[in-house]
């Protein structure tokens, strides 16, 4: 499975006291290992990552196939488990990919430049100080995206919503008569949660990518929920012993790969009529 920064750092510095930051709430603890749990938000120890001077995310320009995005505030929780399952298929199929847990990055809210005037919202984004410009460039460079999302109040997480809001500058290219960067790319959507809201969450996410010109892979959405009548503390055991979440996740990732390999984007180039809001 994907090695976390925590696991890599522990192996390299087994006895060194370092600061550990909770990726959920930002609490910092100093020690040889992270605490057993966060005293502020009660997240387990695997949500801690080694704290270091922040460096802005950059993109080296190297082309790759698929972006795998974990949109949960809990980088190693149940949504992270679903992302792990997806990542295993990507490795097995030998496609090039990059995985991102959004809680590890700094993504500011959208400035809504479009509300001032349409031409003010353009690519590259005017906010160049956070990690989103690199994400923009990778969305343009990759062939497909797989979004893994939790269900929060019958919708996606706030982190993922802000990420998707920040793709407005790419969508708006079609409105200001500039060449688009995303039409014909492929999308797949994976959703998990404690209770209801899976279909709505998936559709909210899909609407964003549809407006960017993405093509949803056939059978490109999968979701799994546990149930409100269970205590949420039992969710992790349920998901990690559930055969359906494994089968459906693997199916969606396979379908994204197969659709991507048809080179639909290249075949549709110059033939699409952008229809966006």
Model segments located where?
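Short Cys/His-rich zinc-binding micro-motifs
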Residues: 21-31
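Short, glycine-/small-residue-rich phosphate/pyrophosphate-handling segment
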Residues: 176-222
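Short helix/strand-capping connector loops at secondary-structure junctions
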Residues: 226-239
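Cysteine-rich micro-motifs
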Residues: 33-45
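Generic recognition of short, well-ordered alpha-helical segments
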Residues: 33-36, 80-81, 158-162, 200-203
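The −1 position to Zn-ligating cysteines in a subset of zinc-ribbon hairpins
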Residues: 21, 37, 109
């Amino acid at each position: 499975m994907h090695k976390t920064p925590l696991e890599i750092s522990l192996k390299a510095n087994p006895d060194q006291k370092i600061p550990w930051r909770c990726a959920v709430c930002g609490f910092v603890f100093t020690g040889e290992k992270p605490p057993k749990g966060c005293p502020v938000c009660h997240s387990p120890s695997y949500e801690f990552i080694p704290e270091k001077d922040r460096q802005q995310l950059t993109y080296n320009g190297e082309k790759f196939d698929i972006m795998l995005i974990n949109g949960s505030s809990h980088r190693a929780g149940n949504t992270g488990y679903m992302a792990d399952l997806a990542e295993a298929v990507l490795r097995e199929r030998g496609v090039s990919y990059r995985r991102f847990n959004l809680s590890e990055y700094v993504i500011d809210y959208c400035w809504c430049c479009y509300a001032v005037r349409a031409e003010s919202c353009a690519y590259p984004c005017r906010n160049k100080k956070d990690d989103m410009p690199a994400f923009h460039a990778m969305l343009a460079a990759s062939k497909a995206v797989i979004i893994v999302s939790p269900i929060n109040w019958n919708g996606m997480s706030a982190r993922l919503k802000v990420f998707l809001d920040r793709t407005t500058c790419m969508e708006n290219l079609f409105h200001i008569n500039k060449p688009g960067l995303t039409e014909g790319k492929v999308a797949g959507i994976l959703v998990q949660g404690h209770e209801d809201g899976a279909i709505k969450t998936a559709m909210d996410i899909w609407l964003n990518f549809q407006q960017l010109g993405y093509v949803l892979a056939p059978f490109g959405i999968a979701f799994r929920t546990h149930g409100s009548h269970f205590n949420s503390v039992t969710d992790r055991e349920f998901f990690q012993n559930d055969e359906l979440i494994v089968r459906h996740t693997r199916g969606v990732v396979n379908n994204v790969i197969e659709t991507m390999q048809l080179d639909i984007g290249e075949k549709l180039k110059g033939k699409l009529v952008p229809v966006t809001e």
